[in-house]
């Protein structure tokens, strides 16, 4: 997605060989026009999948998930990382290790909002090692719902999360795939395009 790649190049900051800071438009300050375009792109890619619900994780996945849900005409449910006083019982639970924060979080979804009749699109801001996506998949599977695919805003293709998910037969659609963050520079995966005659 060209507009996203340009935003990453212009406003993203490479902090190390595996950390990209995008707090100027995605995971702290949010660019609503960009989020709207991201939502439209996810909706376009998954429009034939009969999605009934979008599942994401708090908090950075919420904005792109809501915009995609708006385009698809479905609801969003986000996995919580902390227990809520109003949501104590009747929860699906999974553990997710965060390499960025170096901690394990117990994530949860209410059983009241997802069930076996749902066809789910999982959306998240980043895909690196795949832990968040695997945790969200576990919650959806516990509910007996089917997974249509995973939509990722930015995939760190140099890490193994995307490969692991695809090897499991999961459809993963990433809007920006980063090949490397070496020397303080973002390099995107180049996809060959077929020439139309």
Swiss-Prot record:
One of its GO terms (cellular component) is cytoplasm. Xanthine binds at residues 20, 27, 156. One of its GO terms (biological process) is xanthine metabolic process. Its EC number is 2.4.2.22. InterPro entries: PRibTrfase_dom (IPR000836), PRTase-like (IPR029057), Pur/Pyrimidine_PRTase (IPR050118), Xanthine_PRibTrfase (IPR010079). The keyword Iron-sulfur does not apply. This is Xanthine phosphoribosyltransferase.
């Amino acid at each position: 997605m060209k507009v996203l790649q340009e935003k990453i190049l212009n406003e993203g900051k490479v902090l190390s060989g595996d950390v990209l800071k995008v707090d100027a438009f995605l995971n702290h300050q949010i660019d609503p026009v960009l989020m709207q375009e991201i939502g439209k792109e996810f909706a376009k890619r998954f429009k034939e999948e009969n999605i009934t619900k979008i599942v994401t994780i708090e908090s950075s996945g919420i904005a792109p998930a809501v915009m995609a849900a708006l385009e698809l005409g479905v609801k969003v449910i986000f996995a919580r990382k902390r227990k809520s006083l109003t949501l104590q019982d009747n929860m699906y639970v999974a553990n997710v290790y965060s390499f960025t924060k170096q901690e394990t979080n117990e994530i949860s979804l209410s059983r009241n909002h997802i069930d076996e009749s749902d066809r789910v699109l999982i959306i998240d801001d980043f895909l690196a090692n795949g832990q968040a996506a695997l945790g969200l998949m576990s919650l959806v599977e516990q509910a007996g719902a089917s997974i249509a695919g995973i939509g990722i805003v930015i995939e760190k293709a140099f890490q193994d999360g995307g490969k692991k998910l695809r090897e499991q037969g999961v459809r993963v659609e990433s809007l920006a795939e980063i090949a490397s963050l070496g020397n303080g520079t973002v390099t995107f995966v180049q996809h060959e395009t077929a020439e139309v005659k």
